[in-house]
């Protein structure tokens, strides 16, 4: 177990605050780089001759690579230096975010933005685990709320900065400019002190060997993904060359093949993980002795923990709704409210920054305050915020008066962002500490692949055919559904927290079969 920060002397607490501030700033910067493209949609479409569907798939490329990469990076963070993983991730995302500004066509922009997702994944998995160890117990939701404030703040700030910088210097300079700070801050992350934790069981060389990355074993491990991607690529080629299909259908065929392959890989992992007695040893020196077992162990933990299942499914629905809304909001505002790109992104940035910051931090404090009376506090805040904010967002999308739009947007965004801090804290609450980063990696993988990776291109596709004013209504509806699913977890979280606590103190704890 990691050392409990509040029990340490004052200077160590202060250092924990410094680490939290640095990691929160970088999380914000990660989302700035992620969402800057949504403030640049009209000039990019004009310059590179793209459609809304293309933009949706470019955004989805980031999400897909982020989702696929965050799981193994979560494992690596549990086994090796989290600060090294986080720092390397910052460098990678900054490099490819900069290169994206040099794109000359759809595929270069698609691939560079996908690579940004790999770096962001490495940082996200390692940084969330570090924050959770610096601030355990009742302070965890507040700390993760501060860390997660980068999601709404960075998201809307990226859109706002993109629009303003584009108006001054063009979309290419805007995209490259927001990448530069990451290079400078990566060095500070590399020098962070990692909270005390169990000694690593593997060297880096052993880690790669245990992953069985030889050609033969790699093929055996990922054959569903290879087949799915190959079939998707073949279908895209046939559509384009033989039937003259549009490039949006080509990309959709390829992405569908990749998605089916990823689903097949998940099924393969679950089937290989199945044991006759349904148990696993959670002791550091037990069966968790290689990275592949760690991944399988995380999947098994999720499948056998009711609250985690609700968190995963609810999180995917919320990711579908929230990230889709943030991504397509500037385009919606430009086309339905008659605003220029600069005006829309500035308005979104100003009010989104205020409401998102207040909502995320308030959610963490409220969840921890309720935690003094009931262990259900984090799940309650997460679900109720969505159930209030979702209907407000539906009303918002029907408004065409800017004087009404702004206050409704601010209130809706406040309630929708209450979810950010408590939900990650809830994942750590019901996941064994030994594999905490791995479970969070699995959570991020699932919610993005099943959430905004689908929402972003789907809304773009529907927008090209029916208009953004109609297509966008599916997004808040998904967020409401996510709130309902999370509310189911209110009934199970106490039992699952008690089981994790008992398992942690046992000599040879095992996962129970429900």
Q: Which residues does each PLM region occupy?
A:
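C-terminal transmembrane helical hairpin of 12-TM major facilitator-type secondary transporters
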Residues: 375-423
């Amino acid at each position: 177990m990691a050392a409990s920060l509040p029990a340490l002397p004052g200077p160590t607490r202060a250092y924990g605050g410094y680490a939290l501030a640095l990691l929160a700033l970088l999380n914000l910067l990660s989302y700035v780089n992620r969402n800057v493209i949504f403030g640049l949609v009209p000039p990019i479409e004009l310059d590179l001759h793209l459609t809304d569907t293309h933009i949706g798939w470019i955004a989805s490329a980031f999400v897909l690579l982020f989702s696929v990469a965050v799981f193994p990076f979560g494992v690596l963070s549990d086994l090796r230096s989290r600060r090294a993983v986080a720092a390397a991730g910052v460098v990678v995302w900054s490099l490819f975010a900069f290169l994206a500004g040099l794109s000359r066509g759809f595929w270069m922009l698609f691939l560079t933005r996908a690579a940004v997702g790999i770096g962001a994944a490495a940082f996200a998995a390692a940084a969330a685990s570090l924050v959770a160890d610096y601030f355990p117990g009742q302070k965890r939701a507040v700390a993760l709320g501060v860390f997660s404030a980068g999601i709404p703040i960075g998201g809307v700030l990226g859109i706002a900065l993109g629009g303003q910088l584009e108006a001054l210097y063009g979309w290419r300079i805007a995209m490259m400019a927001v990448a530069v700070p990451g290079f400078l801050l990566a060095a500070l992350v590399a020098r962070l002190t990692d909270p005390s934790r169990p000694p690593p069981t593997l060297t880096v060389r052993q880690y790669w060997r245990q992953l069985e990355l030889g050609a033969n074993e790699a093929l055996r491990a990922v054959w569903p993904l290879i087949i799915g991607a190959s079939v998707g690529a073949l279908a895209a080629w046939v559509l384009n060359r033989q039937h003259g299909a549009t490039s949006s259908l080509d990309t959709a065929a390829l992405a569908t093949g990749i998605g089916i392959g990823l689903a097949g890989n998940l099924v393969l992992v679950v089937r290989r993980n199945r044991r006759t007695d349904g148990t696993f040893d959670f002791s550091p020196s037990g069966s968790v002795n290689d990275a592949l077992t760690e991944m399988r162990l995380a999947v098994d933990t999720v499948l056998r923990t009711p609250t985690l299942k609700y968190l995963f499914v609810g999180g995917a629905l919320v990711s579908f709704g929230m990230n889709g809304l943030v991504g397509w909001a500037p385009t919606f505002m430009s086309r339905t409210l008659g605003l220029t790109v600069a005006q829309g992104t500035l308005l979104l940035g100003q009010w989104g920054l205020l409401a998102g910051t207040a909502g995320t931090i308030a959610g963490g404090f409220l969840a921890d305050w309720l935690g003094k009376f009931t262990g259900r506090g984090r799940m309650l805040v997460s679900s109720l915020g969505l159930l209030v904010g979702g209907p407000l967002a539906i009303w918002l999308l029907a408004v065409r008066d800017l004087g009404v739009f702004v206050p409704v947007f601010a209130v809706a965004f406040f309630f929708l962002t209450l979810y950010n801090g408590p939900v990650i804290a809830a994942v750590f609450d019901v996941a064994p500490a030994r594999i905490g980063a791995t479970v969070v990696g699995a959570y991020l993988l699932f919610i993005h692949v099943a959430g905004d990776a689908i929402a972003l291109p789907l809304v773009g596709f529907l927008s090209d055919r029916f208009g953004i004013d109609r297509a966008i209504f599916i997004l808040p509806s998904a967020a409401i559904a996510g709130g309902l699913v999370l509310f189911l977890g209110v009934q199970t979280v106490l039992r699952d927290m008690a089981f994790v606590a008992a398992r942690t103190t046992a000599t040879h704890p095992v996962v129970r079969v429900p």
